[in-house]
Amino acid sequence: MKAMEKDWYQKNWTLDIHNMSWVEDTNRQVDFLINQLQLKGTEKILDLACGFGRHSLEFARRGYDVTGIDITPAYIDYANEQAKKENLNAKFICQDIRTITFDKEFDVVLNMADGAIGYLEDDGENHKIFSVIAKALKNGGKHFIHFSAENLVRHSRAGMNAA
């Protein structure tokens, strides 16, 4: 992500995370994911563009081994503090998701609330995310994308088809 774009993102997306109405839906959303993905509780989960870790933390509370990645330092700091405070099996890494290098380590990869897909400069950047996902998933792994606003997801189709 270019410096100017990263600065814009930090300024406009670092919000008061505790006063978001959608935070209340987290338990219901995790229940839905467990049901739809037919999870058993032993899966290793990667949450891309995890924000402050609301889904990651809830999965960890339910016994899953979770890794969350986000580019916003304040969100990652908060998520790591919560995981430590609650003694959860979750780790959070501050990094651009296009640059992570996992190799068939995860049973599930999540892109919740778009997970950065469609917010990037062009289809090539979206393709990088799908390449990361393909490399991170174990054989037979599952990928779930939640598109929160179709009109915000400009470039997702080409990336999905190319991965």
Segments predicted by a language model, with ranges:
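A structural alpha-helix within SAM-dependent methyltransferase catalytic domains
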Residues: I34, L57-A60, N80, F130-A134
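A conserved beta-strand element that flanks and buttresses the S-adenosyl-L-methionine
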Residues: L110-M112
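A short glycine-rich, Lys/Arg-flanked "PGG" loop and its adjoining helix->strand segment in the class I
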Residues: E125-N139
